[in-house]
């Protein structure tokens, strides 16, 4: 099976099947701003990004501070969204909440870099599809209480934060799934560099829930 990330690329473009980046909008404290499909902006002091090609099947809601929720049922398309930072860095990211996928879905730290153009995932949990399928193994390392397997894959002429491009995906996939904890992104970046996986200059970085042709729900808080 082809990973749904191979069908979608990033959400500011917005993770995977996007055609063009969506402009950042200022924070607005209204119910409309809290439930806006296919948008990016700020909410509760955090950057957020959400995209879906099936708005009638999925609902994304921004909560206070770093909280967000997403629910989807019999979704025949794709969706991805979450909260984090407009500019990524080697920060420690704390998160907690409820993640209940039924089918193909990821819970991950997700981001992009430029020069080189890299799309990256630190996968903390997933549904029925393991993202390592079809990817190239680059080793493993241990951090935050678990072994993570490292992989790379290539996207050819795919949507990205720089338009349609060919680029590399970096993956860290946690062996022991979890829905709360701390992610030392700096340790992942160092392990990737040691494995010859070199990042560029950081673009956005979020805790994301992604789904493809599945059902499920999640309520997460990031800090």
Curated annotation (Swiss-Prot):
Catalytic activity: Endohydrolysis of (1->4)-beta-D-xylosidic linkages in xylans
Deleted gene: phenotype: Decreases virulence during cotton plant infection.
Enzyme Commission number, as recorded: 3.2.1.8
Pfam families cross-referenced by the UniProt entry: Glyco_hydro_11
Pathway: Glycan degradation; xylan degradation
GO MF entry, a single one: endo-1,4-beta-xylanase activity
Enzyme type, top EC level: hydrolase
Family: Belongs to the glycosyl hydrolase 11 (cellulase G) family.
Function text: Endo-1,4-beta-xylanase involved in the hydrolysis of xylan, a major structural heterogeneous polysaccharide found in plant biomass representing the second most abundant polysaccharide in the biosphere, after cellulose. Acts as an effector that localizes to the host nucleus to contribute to the virulence process. Induces host innate immunity responses; triggers BAK1-and SOBIR1-dependent cell death, salicylic acid signaling and jasmonic acid signaling. Does not exhibit any cell death when transiently expressed in N.benthamiana.
Descriptive protein name: Ethylene-inducing xylanase 1
């Amino acid at each position: 099976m082809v990973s749904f990330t191979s069908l979608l690329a990033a959400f500011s473009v917005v993770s995977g099947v996007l055609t063009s980046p969506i402009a950042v909008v200022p924070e607005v404290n209204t119910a409309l701003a809290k439930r806006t499909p296919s948008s990016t902006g700020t909410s509760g002091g955090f950057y957020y990004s959400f995209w879906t090609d099936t708005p009638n099947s999925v609902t994304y809601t921004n909560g206070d501070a770093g909280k967000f929720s997403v629910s989807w049922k019999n979704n025949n398309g794709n969706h991805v969204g979450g909260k984090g930072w407009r500019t990524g860095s080697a920060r420690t990211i704390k998160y907690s909440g409820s993640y209940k996928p039924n089918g193909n879905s990821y819970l991950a730290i997700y981001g992009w870099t430029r020069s080189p153009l890299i799309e990256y995932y630190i996968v903390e949990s997933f549904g029925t599809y393991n993202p390592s399928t079809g990817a190239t193994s680059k080793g493993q390392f241990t951090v935050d209480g678990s072994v993570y397997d490292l992989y790379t894959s290539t996207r050819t002429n795919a949507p990205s934060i720089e338009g349609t491009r060919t680029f590399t995906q970096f993956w860290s996939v946690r062996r022991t799934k979890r829905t709360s904890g701390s992610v030392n992104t700096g340790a992942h970046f160092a392990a990737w560099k040691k494995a010859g996986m070199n990042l560029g200059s950081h673009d956005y970085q979020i805790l994301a829930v992604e789904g493809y042709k599945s059902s499920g729900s999640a309520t997460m808080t990031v800090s």
